[in-house]
């Protein structure tokens, strides 16, 4: 396969040599030339920046319609659509100043428009914004996005929650393909490291039209790291220290781009000991380590743009059970998880005159090993001590649960020729997946899953009016093998299943501007989620959740219908946003205790009931003139989830109000990009709890942040310092899986990072 791809690239570079060029000059409204403005074409993975005369040049471009994005700090982002019909095209830009964050192109939605032009409201945050929060992991960092929370097991395991929905209801995309890593478990983490990404986009609400089954609750779309600008070499390395866990993270990066070819590689290694609560106790076995490596090669000419990406992620994560031995040891103790994910994606855009085809293929191999300590105790019951110790060593490295998940994805879309006001896309997506057991215990059976979906979507724009809609048909088949497992004088039987599910999804969205400055979006969408392998066929002890889980082969697909209204009012120095939603889910699947006991564990069974979730987010951003350096942010988020019988759904986030003061000083002598921030988080009491939950008290957290950059010659130094939970507040999150044991979340944490870029 690798040889074939290499031959293909070389052949294309030798045969297809003609090219188109775009040149231009970028100025501000005072006709001053701007240095360092980023000029980028997303579909080509190609970019450059302006020189001291404001001049830029992009060569080797296809004869097609392209979107050119121009972005510069302190100015409004501009995007122009241009049809290349001659070898040299001149395109000039005049940028207007803006005190708000740069508008950005949204990749996760089909027409790749600026956020301000998008019919669907999408939250976007950059890697730098996440890192400026001093987050221990990427799981921790996404909590800063309104409407997004995390179900946590210590600090090493985090499960994204979008507006109260999680697990297989939230789809994760990385490097352009869906990330499959047994995401049905609450103690199964995200599996993405921040060193491999450029930014994160969040679709809140059903996105089955775009992504099929499992996008019922929303999508986390991780955009991969960009290639270097044309004919540039970028090198970077950095180190971060975390005081609470006495942990560290080291990363490196390499990028090199030529006119047609481009390369990148980056990696990271992090290690943490048990985290410490406010009462000075360390939570035993919350230690973890993670190794990450990513590489990519890209090629483009006037007919095609391609990117081949590879990523490797391995995590070893302790499973906490109680507060025991107090130590800063980083070597893992039993029980723990050993997780490995390897991903390959091949992203292509083929230009066909007035239209284009995008085609992405991918392969993911996920291995999940769970090591338990019960074998350790059994080995000491009889026999010679030396022999027992040898056997114990063998047992420690023999996982109780071993799951091998192989996934093949494809996604092909035809972007039809555009007219002045109309764009349309038709496409097909699919997946083939196999699950194989290799451990002593079986929780879910060996299985094969096949998906196929066909979709069509279109947008009509005229003046301030934008109307977008689409329809999609999906089909999923699931076949499992029969297993008969002898365990403690009992037989656990996994009956073979042959199931199929189908669904039609649709969406309709409208965007306009009311009263000249209120951007209004109204979206109606339906989605679905077929029952996953765990929900249909579990039959065993799940040590990660300390319960015996029993599947239900009679489950139907979940279907939901959501309405979403978004209002944005913006002036030069003031911005306010209001988002409200109502989400009705038929046949909502959840796990419930049966009050029976099996193998010493309480039995939980998957059942269904209709449910509804509603709530929203409120945001305010004030930039008080003439205090151009000061920004005031306030965000409030809430969600309520109920079954049709009036009972509350479990694991629904508490209401939260976050207020931030941020001071930005672009230049102080040779120091640039200086900032100071103060954030006060007020999480309210959660007493809208499920039948088997208990209320959670309110709490307040105070966080500080500061950062600066210093440049000399071609070397740039970035330094960040964060003090999170500055008052060392003792608290327990409602979404913490350690709440039932009365174990607090992490206490005060000082985070210091230094990054060197050349």
Give residue ranges: language-model regions.
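Outer-membrane beta-barrel signature, preferentially recognizing the C-terminal barrel domain
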Residues: 330-347, 446, 494-513, 517-519, ...
């Amino acid at each position: 396969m690798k040889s074939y791809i290499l031959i293909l690239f070389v052949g294309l570079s030798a045969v297809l040599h003609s090219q188109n060029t775009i040149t231009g000059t970028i100025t501000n409204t005072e006709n001053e030339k701007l240095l360092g403005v980023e000029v980028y074409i997303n579909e080509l993975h190609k970019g450059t920046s302006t020189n001291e005369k404001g001049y830029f040049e992009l060569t080797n471009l296809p004869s097609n319609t392209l979107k050119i994005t121009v972005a510069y700090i302190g100015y409004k982002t501009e995007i122009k659509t241009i049809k290349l019909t001659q070898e040299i095209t001149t395109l000039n830009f005049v940028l207007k100043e803006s005190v708000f964050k740069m508008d950005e192109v949204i990749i996760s939605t089909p027409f790749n428009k600026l956020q301000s032009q998008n019919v669907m409201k999408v939250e976007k945050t950059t890697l730098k914004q996440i890192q400026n929060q001093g987050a221990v992991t990427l799981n921790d960092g996404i909590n800063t996005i309104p409407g997004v929370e995390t179900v946590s097991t210590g600090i090493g395991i985090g499960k994204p929650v979008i507006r109260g929905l999680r697990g297989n209801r939230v789809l994760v995309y990385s490097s352009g393909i869906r990330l499959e890593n047994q995401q049905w478990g609450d103690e199964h983490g995200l599996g993405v490291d921040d060193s491999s990404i450029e930014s994160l986009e969040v679709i809140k609400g059903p996105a089955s039209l775009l992504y099929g089954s499992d996008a019922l609750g929303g999508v986390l779309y991780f955009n991969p790291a960009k290639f270097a600008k044309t004919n540039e070499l970028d090198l970077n390395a950095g180190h971060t220290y975390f005081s609470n866990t006495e942990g560290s993270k080291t990363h490196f990066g390499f990028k090199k781009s030529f006119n047609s070819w481009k390369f990148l590689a980056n990696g990271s290694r992090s290690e943490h000991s048990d985290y410490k609560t406010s009462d000075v106790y360390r939570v035993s076995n919350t230690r973890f380590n993670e190794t990450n490596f990513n590489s990519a090669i890209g090629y483009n000419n006037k007919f095609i743009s391609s990117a081949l990406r590879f990523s490797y992620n391995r995590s070893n994560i302790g499973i906490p059970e109680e507060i025991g031995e107090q130590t800063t040891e980083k070597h893992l103790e039993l029980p723990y998880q050993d997780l490995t994910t390897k991903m390959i994606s091949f992203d292509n855009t083929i230009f066909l005159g007035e239209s284009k085809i995008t085609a992405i293929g991918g392969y993911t191999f996920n291995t999940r090993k769970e090591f338990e300590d019960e074998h350790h105790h059994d080995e000491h019951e009889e026999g010679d001590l030396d022999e027992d110790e040898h056997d114990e060593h063998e047992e420690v490295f023999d996982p109780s649960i071993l799951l091998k998940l192989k996934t093949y994805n494809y996604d092909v879309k035809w972007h039809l020729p555009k007219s002045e006001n109309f764009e349309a896309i038709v496409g097909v997506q699919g997946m083939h997946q196999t699950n194989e057991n290799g451990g002593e215990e079986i929780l879910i059976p060996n299985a094969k899953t096949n998906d196929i979906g066909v979709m069509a979507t279109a947008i009509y724009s005229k003046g301030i009016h934008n109307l977008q809609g689409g329809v999609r048909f999906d089909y999923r088949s699931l076949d499992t093998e029969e297993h008969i497992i002898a365990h403690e004088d009992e037989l656990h039987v996994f009956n073979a299943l042959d199931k199929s599910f189908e669904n039609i999804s649709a969406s309709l969205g409208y965007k306009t501007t009311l009263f000249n400055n209120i951007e209004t979006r109204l979206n109606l969408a339906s989605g679905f989620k077929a029952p996953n392998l765990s929900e249909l066929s579990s039959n065993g002890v799940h040590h990660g959740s300390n319960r015996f889980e029993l599947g239900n082969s009679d489950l139907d697909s979940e279907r939901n219908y959501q309405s979403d209204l978004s209002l944005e009012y913006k002036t030069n120095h003031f911005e306010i946003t209001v988002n409200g939603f109502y989400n009705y889910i038929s046949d909502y699947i959840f796990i419930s205790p049966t009050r029976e006991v099996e193998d010493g564990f309480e039995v939980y069974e998957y059942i269904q009931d209709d449910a509804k979730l509603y709530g929203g987010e409120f945001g305010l951003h004030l930039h008080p003139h003439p205090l151009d350096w000061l920004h005031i942010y306030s965000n409030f988020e809430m969600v309520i989830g109920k079954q049709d019988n009036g009972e509350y759904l479990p694991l629904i986030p508490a209401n939260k109000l976050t207020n931030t003061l941020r001071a930005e000083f672009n230049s102080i002598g040779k120091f640039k990009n200086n900032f100071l921030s103060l954030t006060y988080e007020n999480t309210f009491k959660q007493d809208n709890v499920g039948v088997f939950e208990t209320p959670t008290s309110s709490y307040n957290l105070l966080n500080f942040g500061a950062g600066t950059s210093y440049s000399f010659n071609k070397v740039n130094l970035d330094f960040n310092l964060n003090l999170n939970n500055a008052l060392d507040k003792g608290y327990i999150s409602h979404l913490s899986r350690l709440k039932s044991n009365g174990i607090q979340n992490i206490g005060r944490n000082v985070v210091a990072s230094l990054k060197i870029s050349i």
